[in-house]
């Protein structure tokens, strides 16, 4: 009976450990998440970065959005490239409702960058200030 309780306890511990290792960065404050989520995050960063380099913003959007949502502390490029992707999508979009959706997401990019500013600034040599980001947000707001 004691052995059965021990096996059950070990099984429960292993399940909880698995859940911890499967967390996304947004859930635990890590840069990339853990386990498979970290691999997915790094793959998405690689994919969207290559698309941005070739100005293929439409295909860059989905992997970029996954990083933006799941690993907000992954890299500053999530925000700088995200703004670039969204500006291009707004300019190319003909549907007013979709433009508004992209515009609102662009404003959220700036807001989320401010939210995670301290953690993001630890990753770079030249840190941004809240004023820098607010200025970029105002520029995007009035130029879109």
Q: Model-found features: residue ranges?
A:
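Basic side chains
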Residues: 3-5, 113, 137
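Helix-turn-helix repeat elements of alpha-solenoid scaffolds
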Residues: 23-24, 52-64, 98-115, 144
